[in-house]
Amino acid sequence: MKRFIKSIGIIAAILVILVIFYLFMPRVEGPAVSGNNGNALQEGDIAPDFTATKVDGSTFKLSDHSDECVLINFWATWCGPCVGEMPAFQKLNDDDIDGLEIICIDCQEDEKTVDSFVKENGYTFNIAYDTKGEICAKYPTRGIPYTLVVNKGKIVNIYVGAVDADTQYKEYKSAIDACLGE
């Protein structure tokens, strides 16, 4: 009988560990970022237009920047790789590159969470809300961070995932330089 109770205890402990692991496992996919993979965007496609409200209260409309190079990033505060590459966007913003617009769109989080994150980190580049996932739905992907470089309305580079801020900065800067013909 003691052996049976001990076995039940071990099984219960394993189940608890599995449940805890599942609950706290980072989620890179979710309703905000997943979509019909048959509709995934590709380099050369026209970037779907969108209008987003930025954390400063102003709006960003992609089609208003059709003559510029636009770096669009989809991210969330709970996504470790997303948070890890944010310094790359700040550095690009600080470089003050003529002809470049940066817009980072938070996927389906409440505005207070995003505002708090931006304030805590002192980010000054364009960050926008997509609380209902409407913009993210236009840009289906398997995961975030998901970054696109758009030149004159056309997608020229797509990045899914991140390595570290320095590596991402170099990759994005190279793509932006090519986009701007530098």
Q: Model-flagged regions — what are they?
A:
Residues 84, 92-132, 141-144:
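Conserved segment of the thioredoxin-like fold in thiol-based oxidoreductases
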Residues 116-124, 131-180:
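Thiol/disulfide oxidoreductase modules built on the thioredoxin-like
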Residues 1-46, 182:
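N-terminal targeting signals for export/organelle localization
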Residues 74-91:
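Conserved redox-active cysteine motifs that mediate thiol-disulfide chemistry
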Residues 68-70, 74-78, 143:
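Short pre-active-site segment immediately N-terminal to redox-active cysteine/selenocysteine motifs
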Residues 49-70:
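A short beta-strand-turn-helix
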Residues 71-72, 102, 147:
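Hydrophobic beta-strand anchors of alpha/beta hydrolase catalytic cores
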Residues 50, 60, 74-75, 117, ...:
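Conserved hydrophobic/aromatic "anchor" residues
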